[in-house]
Amino acid sequence: MSMEEKQNFQISQDFSASTIKPNSEEAIAEAIKYCYKKNIPLEINGLSSKKNIGKNFQSQKTLDLSNYSGVIKYEPEELYIKVKSGTSIKEIKEELDKKNQQFAFEPTDFGFLFSGMSNEGTIGGVLSCNFAGPRRFKVG
């Protein structure tokens, strides 16, 4: 993208806070555009369950997706569920349990390692880190 195109992004929200908590796709896109336009390093978080894995990231702003969660559509008979990226693994499992269904993979829970308690994180974190777990080889 050229500098001219970058400067032509239209930003309609105030992003002065260090943590941005959008609750819609439009607000997420706006935040990313804003940081891109201003060359601001942006960290994306859900429940921070994988924050201690890998190299530390120095960011000026955090895009917190914990407000962007929930089941959009669930069709148990089709084995289909559509959720927002900030939806917790726990919430999805609870929804699947109602129809005696389960994941065909096993997301790794690093919570016990870092905090001593369960924190499986969000579906966005699982997919973006490719932490589908060991069961995916057999059933995923």
Q: What name fits each language-model region?
A:
Residues M1-S2, S85:
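Generic secretory/membrane-interface signal
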Residues Q7-N8, I89, V139:
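Broad hydrophobic/π-residue packing in well-ordered secondary structure
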Residues F103-G140:
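A gly/ser-rich beta-alpha-beta helix-loop segment of oxidoreductase catalytic cores
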Residues D14-F110:
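Glycine-rich N-terminal segment of FAD-binding domains in flavoprotein oxidoreductases
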Residues M3-T19:
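Generic N-terminal amphipathic, Lys/Arg-enriched alpha-helix
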Residues S2-Q7, D64-Y68:
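Short amphipathic beta-strand starts and helix->beta connectors
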